[in-house]
Amino acid sequence: MRFKAKEHKEIGDLESAYSFAQTHALTEKNLLTAHRLLATTLLPRAALGKYRDQMVYVYSSAGMEYAALEPEHLASAMRQLFGGIRDLRRSSIDLSEAFYHAALIHLVFVHIHPFMDGNGRAARLLEKWFLASKLGRQVWHVPSEMFYKEHVAEYYRNIKLGLNFYTLDYERCVPFLRMLVRSLLSRVEEPEV
């Protein structure tokens, strides 16, 4: 597979963000720094590592798919999310609970949609970062990002739980939560060559 120069830069930006995450604690401030690294090619410098100050809508070829949380509510929603993450990091949870909460953090973050761009990349990084904080460094090798890319239509279908932040139906989130575990199983079940 050949990559264009911009794609090479985006990959390098992601590698920088993941390297940063592997050597820093999972905090809201550090997530903003990681976003600054991963979105360098995506956004103007003034928007890097900063919550958006305008409404965003997610569109597909079929039209508007999702209206994100209003910008005036982002700081509060992110404080609440990171308060929950902090509590989970301090608590004793088992392996299955760690995967459940990591996937749920990913999903909630995507629904908050705090940045002008790079939200999916930041959500996948946040998911992995949380898992590593609970289970150790070996989690950085879990191929979840590749699995999500290989199943991108399913990924977007499973994220879609409502038309806007206020109509999200988390009772329908189980198919999305299962994708993280399936990313592990897909590699275990691959035939050896």
Regions found by a protein language model. Name each.
Residues M1-V193:
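FIC/Doc superfamily catalytic core
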